[in-house]
Amino acid sequence: MTEAIYETVITTQDATGQAHVAPMGVRYRPLADGSPGVVLMPFKPSVTHDNIVATGHAVLNIVSDTRVFATCVTGRRDAAVLQLLPLAPEGQVAGQRLACALRHLQLRLATRQDDAQRPLLHLAVLAQAEHAPFIGLNRAQAAVVEGAVLVSRLHLLPADKICREMDYLQIAIDKTAAAEELQAWGWLRAAVAAHLQSATPSAAQSATPSPSPAQRQPPAPNPQKDVA
């Protein structure tokens, strides 16, 4: 049976205490003893993987502010969006959580199955806390998450497919987005535009996403992508 994958944000820190934030799909899978667990399978090279192996700890953040996903995959690393808070004094792991998290889970590495491309990290859930209610599903938020996944794969996809996908996702943005989603979407559109402009002139001209009245274009993002 296929396990559901949930889009979350993982915060880790290295041995010196330097924090790292990365969107990551996770599976909720109990440990061998039946206690709650979380599975991560980051692609190498991965700062998240290296930090977890070095410290044995991670924090899983559940967010509804999709700007977190967009700012990470576009390389913007917006400090206001990625604001971190220390864990409560009784925290069981070394780390920080996102200030915008609706909920966070403190994780400790239980087992690791190494792999040349995607190692499997099985982490135990030590503690969790809720900070704000989940108020419901929103189509624009889902579209931003899908757009973020698309942007993370721009180097793998043909230009026409990128534009078709963005145009389809634009429908949900136009109909259901609020200010946060519009800002996140603008960052993603700017990243796509920059990618297409760097392609051959003919490809960029023939594969341009349709303009939208809801689109808010900020300056082009830093092309340097972050490593999960």
Located regions from the model:
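Periplasm/extracytoplasmic soluble domains of Gram-negative envelope assemblies
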Residues: 34-35
